[in-house]
Amino acid sequence: MDKLLLWMSVFTSLLSEAFAQTDLNQKVFVFPRESETDYVKLIPWLEKPLQNFTLCFRAYSDLSRSQSLFSYSVNSRDNELLIYKDKVGQYSLYIGNSKVTVRGLEEFPSPIHFCTSWESSSGIAEFWVNGKPWVKKGLQKGYTVKSSPSIVLGQEQDTYGGGFDKTQSFVGEIADLYMWDSVLTPENIHSVDRGFPPNPNILDWRALNYEINGYVVIKPRMWDNKSS
């Protein structure tokens, strides 16, 4: 019996290290190297088909090459929802494997606060970088983002949960990631930018379910890019 209890204790400890629910306020995921093995898998609080969403996060990288910032894959589509930084000042949003690209002024290297929202009824996608709105774009009007996703930070999924390419990997720090099943108002976006997110119900940095794979480290956030 003692051996069984000891084994269960060790198993529970190992499991808690691999899979955790944590308040990561004022902390970052550090992706310190280019790789095809280092990533964080996120487990959403709410799993449902999405006809609206808003996603916000902070990121800090000194890479000028393209890199994946947020990868949401389903069995039928690898780029069901993808945020991809093509280069400095240029980002692409993929929904259902279709994409739009948005461009704007951006300091480099410098931390960014990035938000995007999309509504199925109009197909309109909105973008906010460091609290400032960028040009709206339109894609996939009438579409529904599929449920049961594999959500990954640090890599771009070319297959469900895998198919990583180190030349698309993120190198840097990610923090304050939140996701809602609704389109936030401009006032809400500014609240998120100031550090007061209004009750995220899909992904919540303050109560995040995640699994670290490979060389990813949690550290205190030493930078701030709040714009207001």
Curated annotation (Swiss-Prot):
Annotated ranges, domain Pentraxin (PTX): 25-224
Binding site for Ca(2+) 1: 78-79, 156-158
Cofactor note as given: Binds 2 calcium ions per subunit.
Disulfide feature: 56-115
Keywords: Amyloid, Calcium, Disulfide bond, Glycoprotein, Lectin, Metal-binding, Secreted, Signal
GO biological process assignments: host-mediated suppression of symbiont invasion; innate immune response; negative regulation of glycoprotein metabolic process; negative regulation of monocyte differentiation; negative regulation of viral process; protein-containing complex assembly
Glycosylation (residues): 52
Cofactor(s) this protein requires: Ca(2+)
Signal sequence region: 1-20
Gene Ontology CC: extracellular space; protein-containing complex
Residues reported to bind Ca(2+) 2: 156, 158, 168
Molecular functions (GO terms): calcium ion binding; carbohydrate binding; complement component C1q complex binding; identical protein binding; virion binding
Subcellular location: Secreted
Annotated PANTHER family: C-REACTIVE PROTEIN-RELATED, SERUM AMYLOID P-COMPONENT
Family: Belongs to the pentraxin family.
Disease tied to this entry: SAP is a precursor of amyloid component P which is found in basement membrane and associated with amyloid deposits.
Subunit details: Homopentamer. Pentraxin (or pentaxin) have a discoid arrangement of 5 non-covalently bound subunits.
Protein's name in the database: Serum amyloid P-component
Gene: Apcs
